[in-house]
Every structure is written in C-alpha cells, then in structure tokens.
C-alpha cells in the first residue's frame, strides 16, 4: 500500500517499522505485566531475545520445508531473503527457543509461556499492518464495499479490489490479545492462557486462509497454514487439560498463574 517512505536519501520500509514496533510493544507489555506479578526481568529479556532468534530461524525453516519442490527446481531460492517468512514457523521457533532457554535457566516454562502469549498476539497485529503496507498476504478479489486496491505493491495484484485479509488478521490478533488478558486476570492454571492462544489463533487463522489469494503452499485442499492451524487447535485443547500436570514437570521454579 505505502510500504516505502522516501525522505531525501533515506527510505523507510513500513513493513520493517511495523515489525519493530510489534517487538517493542510486546516487550514493554511483557515487562510491565511481569514486574507486577513478580517474574524475573532477566528471564523475560532472555526469552525475548531467544524468541526473536528462534522465531526468525523458524520462519525461514518452515518456508524452506513448504517450498521444497520449488527449491529443487531453483536452489537460489535458498538465498532469497527478501521473501519467504512464514508466521507459523516463527511461532513454533520462538516457543521452542524460549522453552530451551527456560530449561537452561531452570525456570518453569509454562508460567512464562502464559505471560508472553498475549504480547505475542499484540505483536502479530502490528506485523499484519506491516503486511498491509507491503501488500503481501493479500486476499481474493471482491466487489464488496470493504475491498482495497493496491497501486504500487510488489506482491499484491495492482488495480483490483481485494479482501483486506491483512486488516482482518490484525483485528483478530488484537481481539485475541484482549481476550487473553481478560482470561489471565482470572488466574487460570499455568499453561492455560497459552493453550487459549493456540486454540483462538488456530481457529482464526484457519478461517482467514479461505479469504487469502497469495501463494503459500498447500496439502491437498488445505493450505499449509490451515493444516498447522488444526494441529495448533488440537495442541491447545490438549495443553489446556494437561496444564495442571505439565506446569512444573522437569523444572525447579515455583509454579505461577499469570494474572
């Protein structure tokens, strides 16, 4: 939409600005909530940096997995860092890296998992605004009043009205964040806020995928993200009921409920 803002010799890429804003907002939210609830600030910082590294690696690794057939035809795709970042890969990579970090620090993972997930959803909302500015993750053509038209996008078709899937996703992410914060205020068992995120995000992402029209890989009639969404929902349901037993397994830190 308006991804590049040129000020003299400086070009500001709004996609990058939104990603950075999302990371910063997520960190500040987590630090603020963690401080109120007595969480170790150093651990939060550690999780934040590990999640960024794991998340960035995850986005690329899942992209490579999805694009194996194309990579076999053109190996140079491996070195194309301008494109190819899969959100679900970032979520999986960030969670895995954070888990490993908590294990090395002998901290219970579930309480911190709960603490950060509302902020993760908030950051995703910013990221989807970045997608809107760049024109990626675009929707199907529509004649509806809410359709948007891109004119200078390197990703979306220009000059035709499209369903604003990026804005729909952003709204969904912010709503999920609000719901998770409300749920966390009820002091549920450790692990259940994160479980709720997996279920809510999985359902929302599965639905939005039907509205998208960008190429993103498929498994049969479902997109790769829809298949992962099904796994996320199932995993979230299992985690919700297993959370009381899993919260302190293999950790020495005291279990906490995030409020």
Stretches with model-predicted labels:
Residues 1-259:
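A feature for loop-to-transmembrane-helix boundaries and adjacent hydrophobic helices
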């Amino acid at each position: 939409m308006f991804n590049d803002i040129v000020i003299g010799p400086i070009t500001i890429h709004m996609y990058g600005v939104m990603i950075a804003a999302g990371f910063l907002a997520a960190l500040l939210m987590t630090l603020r909530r963690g401080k109120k609830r007595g969480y170790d600030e150093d651990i939060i910082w550690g999780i934040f940096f590990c999640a960024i590294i794991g998340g960035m690696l995850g986005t690329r690794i899942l992209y490579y997995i999805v694009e194996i057939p194309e990579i076999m035809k053109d190996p140079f795709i491996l070195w194309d860092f301008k494109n190819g970042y899969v959100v679900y890969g970032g979520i999986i990579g960030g969670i895995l890296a954070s888990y490993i970090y908590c294990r090395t620090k002998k901290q219970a993972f579930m309480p911190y998992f709960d603490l950060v997930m509302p902020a993760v959803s908030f950051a995703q909302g910013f990221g989807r605004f970045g997608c809107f500015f760049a024109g990626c993750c675009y929707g199907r053509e529509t004649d509806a009043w809410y359709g948007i038209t891109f004119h200078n996008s390197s990703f979306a078709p220009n000059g035709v009205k499209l369903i604003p899937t990026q804005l729909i996703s952003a709204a969904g992410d912010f709503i999920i964040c609000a719901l998770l914060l409300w749920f966390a205020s009820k002091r549920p068992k450790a692990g259940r806020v994160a479980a709720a995120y997996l279920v809510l995000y999985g359902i929302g992402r599965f639905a939005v995928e039907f509205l998208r029209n960008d190429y993103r890989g498929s498994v049969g009639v479902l997109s790769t993200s829809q298949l992962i969404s099904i796994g996320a929902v199932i995993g979230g349901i299992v985690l919700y009921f297993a959370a009381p037993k899993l919260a302190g397994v293999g950790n020495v830190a005291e279990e906490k409920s995030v409020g």
